[in-house]
Protein backbone atom coordinates (compact mmCIF):
# COMPACT_ATOMS: atom_id res chain seq x y z
CA UNK A 1 0.00 0.00 0.00
CA UNK A 2 1.40 3.41 -0.94
CA UNK A 3 1.99 5.83 1.90
CA UNK A 4 0.02 9.06 1.89
CA UNK A 5 1.83 12.40 1.93
CA UNK A 6 0.66 12.99 5.49
CA UNK A 7 2.09 9.64 6.58
CA UNK A 8 5.43 10.48 4.99
CA UNK A 9 5.55 13.89 6.65
CA UNK A 10 4.66 12.35 9.99
CA UNK A 11 7.49 9.86 9.58
CA UNK A 12 9.96 12.60 8.71
CA UNK A 13 9.01 14.42 11.91
CA UNK A 14 9.47 11.22 13.92
CA UNK A 15 12.80 10.66 12.20
CA UNK A 16 13.94 14.16 13.08
CA UNK A 17 12.92 13.82 16.72
CA UNK A 18 14.72 10.48 16.90
CA UNK A 19 18.00 11.61 15.36
CA UNK A 20 18.13 15.02 17.02
CA UNK A 21 19.45 13.11 20.04
CA UNK A 22 22.67 12.67 18.09
CA UNK A 23 23.72 16.08 19.30
CA UNK A 24 22.10 16.21 22.72
CA UNK A 25 24.87 14.23 24.38
CA UNK A 26 27.51 16.61 23.07
CA UNK A 27 25.91 20.04 22.96
CA UNK A 28 24.65 21.64 26.16
CA UNK A 29 21.03 22.71 26.32
CA UNK A 30 20.41 26.15 24.85
CA UNK A 31 17.67 28.33 23.43
CA UNK A 32 16.59 27.28 19.97
CA UNK A 33 16.37 30.85 18.62
CA UNK A 34 17.44 34.38 19.47
CA UNK A 35 15.91 37.78 18.97
CA UNK A 36 18.98 38.98 17.07
CA UNK A 37 19.90 37.36 13.76
CA UNK A 38 23.23 37.87 12.01
CA UNK A 39 22.77 37.33 8.28
CA UNK A 40 25.81 36.66 6.10
CA UNK A 41 24.87 36.35 2.42
CA UNK A 42 27.16 35.45 -0.51
CA UNK A 43 26.40 37.02 -3.88
CA UNK A 44 25.58 33.70 -5.56
CA UNK A 45 22.58 31.68 -4.44
CA UNK A 46 24.21 28.31 -5.10
CA UNK A 47 27.33 29.35 -3.17
CA UNK A 48 29.58 27.92 -5.89
CA UNK A 49 32.50 29.73 -7.52
CA UNK A 50 35.38 29.00 -9.85
CA UNK A 51 38.99 29.49 -8.81
CA UNK A 52 39.89 33.20 -8.48
CA UNK A 53 36.28 34.29 -8.99
CA UNK A 54 35.51 37.13 -6.54
CA UNK A 55 32.86 36.60 -3.88
CA UNK A 56 31.10 39.35 -1.95
CA UNK A 57 29.59 38.56 1.44
CA UNK A 58 26.96 41.00 2.66
CA UNK A 59 26.60 41.24 6.44
CA UNK A 60 23.34 42.42 8.01
CA UNK A 61 21.93 42.25 11.52
CA UNK A 62 18.23 41.93 12.27
CA UNK A 63 16.10 42.34 15.39
CA UNK A 64 12.60 40.91 15.18
CA UNK A 65 13.15 40.68 11.41
CA UNK A 66 13.92 44.39 11.14
CA UNK A 67 17.34 45.54 9.98
CA UNK A 68 19.53 47.25 12.57
CA UNK A 69 21.58 50.23 11.41
CA UNK A 70 23.90 51.18 14.26
CA UNK A 71 25.81 47.96 14.88
CA UNK A 72 29.48 46.98 14.88
CA UNK A 73 30.76 43.55 13.94
CA UNK A 74 33.93 41.48 13.98
CA UNK A 75 34.59 39.14 11.09
CA UNK A 76 37.00 36.46 9.95
CA UNK A 77 37.45 35.58 6.29
CA UNK A 78 39.41 32.75 4.72
CA UNK A 79 39.59 28.98 4.26
CA UNK A 80 37.65 27.06 6.93
CA UNK A 81 39.53 27.12 10.28
CA UNK A 82 42.36 29.13 8.68
CA UNK A 83 41.07 32.71 8.29
CA UNK A 84 43.48 34.98 6.44
CA UNK A 85 41.71 38.23 7.29
CA UNK A 86 40.42 39.33 10.71
CA UNK A 87 38.76 42.66 11.44
CA UNK A 88 37.15 44.01 14.61
CA UNK A 89 34.60 46.72 15.41
CA UNK A 90 33.54 47.27 11.82
CA UNK A 91 30.46 49.51 11.54
CA UNK A 92 27.50 48.57 9.38
CA UNK A 93 26.97 51.46 6.99
CA UNK A 94 23.32 51.88 6.09
CA UNK A 95 22.69 48.57 7.80
CA UNK A 96 25.19 46.45 5.92
CA UNK A 97 28.85 45.65 5.41
CA UNK A 98 30.31 44.05 2.30
CA UNK A 99 33.35 41.80 2.59
CA UNK A 100 35.15 40.59 -0.51
CA UNK A 101 37.27 37.48 -0.92
CA UNK A 102 38.33 34.75 -3.31
CA UNK A 103 40.28 31.50 -3.43
CA UNK A 104 42.81 30.47 -6.05
CA UNK A 105 42.63 26.76 -5.23
CA UNK A 106 39.72 24.33 -4.72
CA UNK A 107 38.24 24.58 -1.24
CA UNK A 108 35.72 26.46 0.88
CA UNK A 109 35.81 30.14 1.82
CA UNK A 110 34.08 31.07 5.07
CA UNK A 111 33.01 34.45 6.42
CA UNK A 112 32.32 34.22 10.15
CA UNK A 113 30.78 37.22 11.91
CA UNK A 114 30.19 38.31 15.50
CA UNK A 115 27.80 41.24 16.03
CA UNK A 116 27.76 43.32 19.21
CA UNK A 117 24.27 44.38 20.25
CA UNK A 118 23.35 45.82 23.65
CA UNK A 119 26.38 44.30 25.33
CA UNK A 120 25.81 40.83 23.93
CA UNK A 121 27.47 38.95 21.08
CA UNK A 122 25.63 37.18 18.27
CA UNK A 123 27.19 35.11 15.52
CA UNK A 124 26.50 34.16 11.94
CA UNK A 125 28.42 32.72 9.03
CA UNK A 126 28.34 31.82 5.37
CA UNK A 127 30.51 29.41 3.42
CA UNK A 128 31.00 29.11 -0.32
CA UNK A 129 32.68 26.45 -2.40
CA UNK A 130 35.48 27.02 -4.89
CA UNK A 131 35.50 24.17 -7.40
CA UNK A 132 34.72 21.66 -4.62
CA UNK A 133 34.58 18.81 -7.14
CA UNK A 134 38.35 19.24 -7.55
CA UNK A 135 39.24 18.86 -3.86
CA UNK A 136 41.63 15.98 -3.32
CA UNK A 137 42.19 14.25 0.04
CA UNK A 138 45.42 14.61 1.98
CA UNK A 139 45.13 11.28 3.81
CA UNK A 140 47.05 8.53 2.07
CA UNK A 141 46.24 4.83 2.18
CA UNK A 142 48.56 2.43 4.03
CA UNK A 143 49.79 -0.39 1.82
CA UNK A 144 48.23 -2.99 4.10
CA UNK A 145 44.90 -1.15 4.55
CA UNK A 146 42.74 -3.75 2.81
CA UNK A 147 44.56 -6.77 4.22
CA UNK A 148 44.40 -5.25 7.70
CA UNK A 149 40.64 -4.93 7.64
CA UNK A 150 40.12 -8.31 5.99
CA UNK A 151 42.20 -9.86 8.76
CA UNK A 152 40.42 -7.87 11.48
CA UNK A 153 37.00 -9.03 10.31
CA UNK A 154 38.16 -12.62 9.84
CA UNK A 155 39.33 -12.64 13.46
CA UNK A 156 36.06 -11.10 14.63
CA UNK A 157 34.06 -13.80 12.87
CA UNK A 158 35.91 -16.48 14.78
CA UNK A 159 33.63 -15.41 17.63
CA UNK A 160 30.10 -16.76 17.25
CA UNK A 161 27.29 -14.21 17.15
CA UNK A 162 25.41 -15.96 19.97
CA UNK A 163 22.48 -13.54 19.52
CA UNK A 164 19.82 -12.67 22.07
CA UNK A 165 16.36 -11.34 21.22
CA UNK A 166 14.00 -10.00 23.89
CA UNK A 167 10.53 -8.98 22.75
CA UNK A 168 9.46 -5.50 23.92
CA UNK A 169 5.64 -5.85 24.02
CA UNK A 170 5.11 -2.20 24.95
CA UNK A 171 6.81 -1.13 21.72
CA UNK A 172 5.16 -3.61 19.37
CA UNK A 173 2.38 -2.52 17.04
CA UNK A 174 -0.28 -4.37 15.11
CA UNK A 175 2.20 -4.62 12.21
CA UNK A 176 5.62 -4.85 13.85
CA UNK A 177 7.40 -6.89 16.51
CA UNK A 178 10.10 -4.93 18.34
CA UNK A 179 13.04 -6.60 20.07
CA UNK A 180 15.99 -5.56 22.17
CA UNK A 181 18.79 -7.61 20.64
CA UNK A 182 22.47 -8.24 21.17
CA UNK A 183 25.20 -10.28 19.52
CA UNK A 184 28.90 -10.81 20.04
CA UNK A 185 31.31 -8.82 17.91
CA UNK A 186 35.11 -9.20 18.29
CA UNK A 187 35.50 -11.61 21.22
CA UNK A 188 33.34 -13.66 23.57
CA UNK A 189 31.45 -11.38 25.92
CA UNK A 190 31.90 -8.25 23.84
CA UNK A 191 28.46 -7.44 22.46
CA UNK A 192 26.66 -5.01 20.21
CA UNK A 193 23.14 -3.99 21.28
CA UNK A 194 20.28 -2.61 19.26
CA UNK A 195 16.57 -2.39 18.54
CA UNK A 196 15.29 -4.80 15.89
CA UNK A 197 11.94 -4.27 14.18
CA UNK A 198 10.41 -7.06 12.07
CA UNK A 199 7.08 -7.00 10.21
CA UNK A 200 4.62 -9.44 11.77
CA UNK A 201 3.26 -10.60 8.44
CA UNK A 202 5.00 -13.71 7.17
CA UNK A 203 7.31 -13.14 4.26
CA UNK A 204 10.79 -12.14 3.15
CA UNK A 205 11.85 -8.53 3.61
CA UNK A 206 14.67 -6.13 2.75
CA UNK A 207 16.72 -4.82 5.67
CA UNK A 208 18.01 -1.46 6.85
CA UNK A 209 20.84 -1.00 9.36
CA UNK A 210 20.82 2.37 11.13
CA UNK A 211 24.17 3.36 12.64
CA UNK A 212 24.45 6.09 15.28
CA UNK A 213 25.84 9.57 15.47
CA UNK A 214 28.28 10.48 18.21
CA UNK A 215 27.19 10.27 21.83
CA UNK A 216 25.59 7.72 24.12
CA UNK A 217 21.83 7.32 24.30
CA UNK A 218 18.89 4.89 24.24
CA UNK A 219 17.25 3.92 20.95
CA UNK A 220 13.65 3.47 19.86
CA UNK A 221 14.20 1.59 16.63
CA UNK A 222 12.73 2.42 13.23
CA UNK A 223 9.25 1.01 13.71
CA UNK A 224 7.66 3.03 10.94
CA UNK A 225 9.90 1.75 8.15
CA UNK A 226 9.34 -1.77 9.44
CA UNK A 227 5.58 -1.20 9.30
CA UNK A 228 5.95 -0.46 5.59
CA UNK A 229 7.66 -3.78 4.88
CA UNK A 230 11.33 -3.79 5.87
CA UNK A 231 13.43 -5.23 8.69
CA UNK A 232 15.21 -2.46 10.59
CA UNK A 233 18.04 -2.67 13.09
CA UNK A 234 19.21 0.41 14.97
CA UNK A 235 22.41 -0.27 16.90
CA UNK A 236 24.46 1.38 19.60
CA UNK A 237 28.24 1.12 19.47
CA UNK A 238 29.27 1.14 23.12
CA UNK A 239 28.65 -2.46 24.12
CA UNK A 240 25.85 -1.63 26.55
CA UNK A 241 22.05 -2.15 26.43
CA UNK A 242 20.16 0.58 24.57
CA UNK A 243 16.98 0.60 26.66
CA UNK A 244 18.23 2.39 29.79
CA UNK A 245 17.34 5.94 30.88
CA UNK A 246 19.22 8.88 29.41
CA UNK A 247 20.73 9.71 32.81
CA UNK A 248 22.48 6.32 32.77
CA UNK A 249 24.14 7.18 29.46
CA UNK A 250 24.96 10.71 30.58
CA UNK A 251 26.91 9.31 33.51
CA UNK A 252 28.91 7.11 31.14
CA UNK A 253 29.50 9.94 28.70
CA UNK A 254 30.82 12.15 31.49
CA UNK A 255 32.76 9.30 33.10
CA UNK A 256 34.31 6.15 31.68
CA UNK A 257 33.38 6.93 28.06
CA UNK A 258 34.16 10.64 28.04
CA UNK A 259 35.75 11.52 24.70
CA UNK A 260 35.50 7.85 23.75
CA UNK A 261 36.55 8.70 20.19
CA UNK A 262 40.07 9.34 21.50
CA UNK A 263 40.46 6.13 23.49
CA UNK A 264 43.61 4.25 22.40
CA UNK A 265 43.98 6.35 19.25
CA UNK A 266 47.71 5.62 19.17
CA UNK A 267 47.14 1.85 18.84
CA UNK A 268 45.68 0.56 15.57
CA UNK A 269 44.28 -2.64 17.11
CA UNK A 270 43.09 -1.25 20.46
CA UNK A 271 41.58 1.97 19.08
CA UNK A 272 37.96 2.42 20.18
CA UNK A 273 36.62 2.37 16.63
CA UNK A 274 38.20 -1.00 15.86
CA UNK A 275 35.49 -2.83 17.81
CA UNK A 276 32.86 -0.34 16.62
CA UNK A 277 33.55 -1.01 12.94
CA UNK A 278 33.73 -4.76 13.47
CA UNK A 279 30.43 -4.46 15.35
CA UNK A 280 28.78 -2.84 12.32
CA UNK A 281 29.87 -5.76 10.14
CA UNK A 282 28.63 -8.24 12.74
CA UNK A 283 25.31 -6.37 12.63
CA UNK A 284 25.17 -7.21 8.93
CA UNK A 285 25.98 -10.82 9.85
CA UNK A 286 23.09 -10.75 12.31
CA UNK A 287 20.61 -9.31 9.81
CA UNK A 288 21.63 -11.89 7.21
CA UNK A 289 21.01 -14.66 9.73
CA UNK A 290 17.33 -13.74 10.14
CA UNK A 291 14.92 -16.06 8.38
CA UNK A 292 12.74 -13.07 7.40
CA UNK A 293 15.57 -11.39 5.45
CA UNK A 294 15.18 -11.63 1.67
CA UNK A 295 18.95 -12.01 1.07
CA UNK A 296 18.73 -9.36 -1.64
CA UNK A 297 18.48 -5.81 -0.33
CA UNK A 298 20.38 -4.46 2.66
CA UNK A 299 21.10 -0.79 3.26
CA UNK A 300 22.92 1.21 5.91
CA UNK A 301 22.26 4.81 6.91
CA UNK A 302 23.35 7.33 9.51
CA UNK A 303 24.51 10.88 10.12
CA UNK A 304 27.78 12.43 11.32
CA UNK A 305 29.62 9.57 13.05
CA UNK A 306 26.84 7.40 11.63
CA UNK A 307 27.48 8.82 8.18
CA UNK A 308 31.08 7.66 8.46
CA UNK A 309 30.01 4.22 9.69
CA UNK A 310 27.56 3.97 6.77
CA UNK A 311 30.36 4.45 4.25
CA UNK A 312 32.71 2.14 6.14
CA UNK A 313 30.17 -0.67 6.45
CA UNK A 314 29.22 -0.47 2.77
CA UNK A 315 32.89 -0.49 1.78
CA UNK A 316 33.80 -3.50 3.92
CA UNK A 317 30.77 -5.73 3.31
CA UNK A 318 29.64 -6.55 -0.21
CA UNK A 319 26.28 -7.78 1.08
CA UNK A 320 25.34 -4.12 1.56
CA UNK A 321 23.45 -2.97 -1.54
CA UNK A 322 23.12 0.76 -0.78
CA UNK A 323 24.18 3.34 1.81
CA UNK A 324 22.94 6.83 2.75
CA UNK A 325 25.23 9.07 4.83
CA UNK A 326 24.31 12.53 6.06
CA UNK A 327 27.19 14.91 6.89
CA UNK A 328 29.72 12.09 7.45
CA UNK A 329 32.48 12.56 10.01
CA UNK A 330 35.91 10.92 10.10
CA UNK A 331 36.89 12.26 6.66
CA UNK A 332 40.42 13.29 5.65
CA UNK A 333 41.93 13.38 9.14
CA UNK A 334 45.36 14.36 7.80
CA UNK A 335 44.13 17.48 5.99
CA UNK A 336 45.29 19.59 8.92
CA UNK A 337 48.87 18.75 8.04
CA UNK A 338 48.41 20.90 4.94
CA UNK A 339 46.52 23.65 6.78
CA UNK A 340 43.12 22.51 5.59
CA UNK A 341 40.17 21.60 7.79
CA UNK A 342 39.91 17.87 8.47
CA UNK A 343 36.90 15.91 9.65
CA UNK A 344 35.41 15.24 13.07
CA UNK A 345 36.78 14.41 15.63
CA UNK A 346 39.71 16.57 14.49
CA UNK A 347 42.51 14.36 15.77
CA UNK A 348 45.18 16.48 14.08
CA UNK A 349 43.65 19.94 14.41
CA UNK A 350 45.84 23.01 14.46
CA UNK A 351 45.38 23.35 18.23
CA UNK A 352 46.63 19.83 18.91
CA UNK A 353 50.20 18.60 19.03
CA UNK A 354 50.52 16.08 16.22
CA UNK A 355 51.60 12.66 17.42
CA UNK A 356 53.14 10.41 14.81
CA UNK A 357 51.32 7.38 16.21
CA UNK A 358 47.94 9.14 16.00
CA UNK A 359 48.64 10.18 12.43
CA UNK A 360 49.48 6.63 11.42
CA UNK A 361 46.46 5.10 13.16
CA UNK A 362 44.07 7.68 11.67
CA UNK A 363 44.81 6.44 8.18
CA UNK A 364 43.18 3.09 8.97
CA UNK A 365 40.03 4.84 10.20
CA UNK A 366 39.56 7.48 7.52
CA UNK A 367 36.46 7.50 5.34
CA UNK A 368 38.66 8.69 2.47
CA UNK A 369 40.36 5.30 2.33
CA UNK A 370 37.23 3.20 2.82
CA UNK A 371 35.47 5.19 0.10
CA UNK A 372 37.83 3.82 -2.52
CA UNK A 373 36.29 0.35 -2.06
CA UNK A 374 32.65 1.34 -2.51
CA UNK A 375 30.81 -0.43 -5.32
CA UNK A 376 27.12 0.22 -4.58
CA UNK A 377 24.91 3.33 -4.89
CA UNK A 378 25.23 6.01 -2.23
CA UNK A 379 23.19 9.09 -1.33
CA UNK A 380 25.01 11.96 0.41
CA UNK A 381 23.89 15.29 1.81
CA UNK A 382 25.47 18.06 3.86
CA UNK A 383 25.68 21.81 4.25
CA UNK A 384 28.51 24.25 3.68
CA UNK A 385 28.10 25.89 7.10
CA UNK A 386 28.87 22.71 9.04
CA UNK A 387 31.42 23.55 11.75
CA UNK A 388 31.62 20.01 13.12
CA UNK A 389 32.20 18.11 9.89
CA UNK A 390 33.74 20.71 7.55
CA UNK A 391 32.55 20.42 3.94
CA UNK A 392 36.18 20.35 2.79
CA UNK A 393 36.68 17.00 4.52
CA UNK A 394 33.42 15.48 3.30
CA UNK A 395 33.95 16.62 -0.27
CA UNK A 396 37.48 15.17 -0.28
CA UNK A 397 36.06 11.76 0.62
CA UNK A 398 33.15 12.04 -1.81
CA UNK A 399 35.44 12.90 -4.71
CA UNK A 400 37.34 9.62 -4.33
CA UNK A 401 34.21 7.50 -4.89
CA UNK A 402 33.95 5.91 -8.34
CA UNK A 403 30.71 3.94 -7.83
CA UNK A 404 27.22 5.45 -8.40
CA UNK A 405 26.64 8.37 -6.04
CA UNK A 406 24.40 11.37 -5.44
CA UNK A 407 25.24 14.56 -3.54
CA UNK A 408 22.46 16.85 -2.32
CA UNK A 409 23.79 20.13 -0.98
CA UNK A 410 21.84 22.42 1.34
CA UNK A 411 24.29 25.36 1.41
CA UNK A 412 23.06 27.08 4.59
CA UNK A 413 22.87 23.83 6.52
CA UNK A 414 25.18 23.48 9.52
CA UNK A 415 25.57 20.33 11.60
CA UNK A 416 21.85 19.68 11.51
CA UNK A 417 19.32 19.08 8.75
CA UNK A 418 16.19 20.64 7.34
CA UNK A 419 12.81 18.91 7.13
CA UNK A 420 13.10 18.87 3.34
CA UNK A 421 16.54 17.29 3.56
CA UNK A 422 15.37 14.57 5.92
CA UNK A 423 12.38 13.84 3.70
CA UNK A 424 14.61 13.57 0.62
CA UNK A 425 16.95 11.24 2.53
CA UNK A 426 14.12 9.02 3.74
CA UNK A 427 12.45 8.86 0.34
CA UNK A 428 15.66 7.68 -1.30
CA UNK A 429 16.12 4.99 1.35
CA UNK A 430 12.52 3.81 0.93
CA UNK A 431 12.99 3.68 -2.83
CA UNK A 432 16.03 1.41 -2.44
CA UNK A 433 14.01 -0.79 -0.08
CA UNK A 434 11.15 -0.79 -2.61
CA UNK A 435 8.63 0.20 0.03
CA UNK A 436 7.55 3.66 -1.14
Predicted regions and their residues:
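Hydrolase active-site cap/lid region
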Residues: 307-354, 409, 417-420
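Cap/lid segment of the alpha/beta-hydrolase catalytic domain
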Residues: 217-278, 335-342
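Gly/Ser-rich "nucleophile elbow"/oxyanion-hole loop immediately N-terminal to the catalytic nucleophile
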Residues: 259-299, 303
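Short alpha-helix in the alpha/beta-hydrolase fold that links the catalytic acid
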Residues: 376, 390-398
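Short beta-strand/loop motif that positions the catalytic acidic residue
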Residues: 374, 380-382
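Short beta-strand element of the alpha/beta-hydrolase
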Residues: 204-213
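N-terminal cap/lid segment of alpha/beta-hydrolase-fold proteins
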Residues: 43, 161-201
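C-terminal catalytic histidine-bearing segment of alpha/beta-hydrolase fold enzymes
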Residues: 395-436
